[in-house]
Design a protein with these regions (language model features):
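Extracellular/periplasmic Venus flytrap/periplasmic-binding protein
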Residues: 84-85, 131-132, 140-248, 288-295
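Short, low-complexity disordered leader/linker segments with a strong preference
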Residues: 1-32, 406-416
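Extracellular/periplasmic periplasmic-binding protein-like sensory domains
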Residues: 245-322, 397-404, 409-412
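Beta-alpha junction/loop-to-helix N-cap segments that form part of ligand/metal-binding clefts
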Residues: 30-32, 45-52, 59, 64-136, ...
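Venus flytrap/periplasmic-binding-protein-like
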Residues: 79, 124-125, 130-134, 209, ...
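Periplasmic-binding protein-like
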Residues: 93-106, 124-126, 172-177, 224-235, ...
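Immediate post-signal peptide segment of exported/extracytoplasmic ligand-binding proteins
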Residues: 23-35, 63-71, 163-172, 343
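Segments of small-molecule ligand-sensing domains
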Residues: 306-318, 329-394, 414-416
Length: 416
């Protein structure tokens, strides 16, 4: 009798457990990432290519069994590049149990910085956001994970110096920028380097929405007579700059754009490769389709009986999506390895980011080394050039003027 009662009790406990759903161990077989995106707002030309790249890399990882036995769940919310919607998206992601937020946009990064720190959830701002966030001691839960605007500005000066024979003394550099906080961000670096290298710096602001800059192009080419142009433009304005500088006869081989003016879409909107021939652009992810990870994604689609997505042809933005997802998942991998079988938190993923070193994804990712002190990972960019109508690699991964950047990061930290 006792035995049968014990069996009945055991079955009852099992039934209750089954009805109650999976326990913590089973539930934790999924790690949630909050993916903010813009597919319908002001920067949709980026989002509609970048976010599919992110999802495809997550699918590739999950198709191989996930990470340390856990599947990755990326929950995308389109915030239309509007800050209120971005804040709402964050709260929804937090309720879903996200241990990491993929931020999209400089104003969103600035709005979320304090919240992420209070909630101990890491957020990433690759190629945008606040440059001072490279300092992990002052911004513990913000990870640029790619070259900030300060680092991009420094590389722009180094590249101009190389292109102009190894010396900038007495040269004229034009800084053509979108007149908003992000556009103005590199100015302190450029001003410091002008004094250090002995070149003249003149700034040319382009008011939003950035679709008219004939006057600036004429001034750069015929009045100021710049020796080199560093451009930092967004949205439709990069293509306008290419067309206008070309129209006034300024050689595009003397122009280098920061990362948001260097996509296939910018070249197409300017009139195609023949118009943009010679134009240089910085990249924080590899460009082109010849990378092992992209071959794996194509193979995944083929196995499913599908054609690779059309977005893959826009290699600049699609590849950036792959890079962001890959760095995120590497941080999660490190967190899971440090806490096998346990429930990982945002703090664990933060620690996972700070252990990333030597992860290059076959060359698509630069040689990042993220630490508790350096959340940027080194400030690496490659420069590509339009040759024969296509983006072709012009430099290897590079960075510049670390002592100048360190000074500004330290000064910004002292004010925080």
């Amino acid at each position: 009798m006792r035995k049968s009662v014990a069996v009945m009790i055991g079955l009852l406990v099992l039934a209750v457990a089954t009805l109650a759903g999976p326990g913590p161990a089973a539930a934790q077989k999924e790690v949630v990432i909050g993916l903010q995106c813009d597919r319908t707002g002001a920067t949709q030309t980026v989002g509609v290519k970048l976010c599919p790249g992110y999802h495809d890399y997550v699918r590739l990882v999950n198709s191989k069994g996930g990470i340390e036995g856990y599947k990755i769940k990326a929950i995308e919310i389109d915030h239309e590049y509007k800050v209120p919607q971005g804040m709402e998206a964050y709260e929804r992601h937090k309720k879903e149990g996200a241990v990491l937020i993929s931020i999209y946009g400089t104003p969103h990064t600035q709005a979320l910085t304090q919240k992420l720190t209070e909630d101990r959830i890491p957020g990433t701002s690759p190629g945008f956001g606040t440059s001072a966030a490279a300092d992990g001691t002052k911004y513990p839960y913000i990870f640029p994970i790619a070259a900030t605007y300060w680092s991009q500005g420094a590389v722009g000066v180094k590249f101009a110096k190389a292109q102009l024979g190894g010396s900038l003394k007495g040269k004229k550099i034009a800084y053509l920028f979108y007149d908003n906080p992000a556009g103005r961000e590199p100015l302190p670096i450029l001003e410091d380097l002008a004094a250090q290298e002995g070149f003249q710096l003149k700034v040319f602001a382009v008011p939003p929405p950035g679709i008219e800059m004939g006057a600036q192009a004429l001034d750069i080419a015929q009045r100021y007579r710049a020796d080199f142009v560093i451009a930092h433009l967004f949205g439709r304005s990069p293509s306008v700059s290419i067309k206008e500088l070309k129209r006034v006869g300024f050689p595009l081989r003397k122009v280098v754009s920061m990362v948001w003016g260097a996509s296939e879409a910018d070249v197409e909107a300017a009139g195609g490769g023949a118009v943009a021939e010679g134009y240089y652009g910085m990249q924080f992810a590899g460009v082109g389709s010849d990378y092992p990870v992209l071959n794996e994604i194509r193979a995944m689609y083929k196995k499913e009986g599908k054609e690779p997505p059309a977005e893959m042809a826009s290699t600049v933005f699609y590849n950036r999506g792959v890079l962001i997802a890959a760095v995120h998942i590497e941080a999660i991998r490190n967190a899971l390895k440090a806490k096998p079988g346990g429930t990982i938190t945002g703090a664990d993923v933060k620690a996972g980011f700070e252990k990333i070193k030597g992860f290059t994804l076959g060359g698509l990712v630069p040689p990042l080394e993220i630490t508790a002190l350096d959340h940027e990972g080194g400030g690496w960019v490659q420069i590509f050039q339009i040759r024969g109508g296509k983006w072709m690699k012009a430099t290897e991964w590079d960075k510049a003027y670390p002592e100048v950047l360190a000074k500004h990061i330290k000064e910004a930290g002292a004010k925080k």
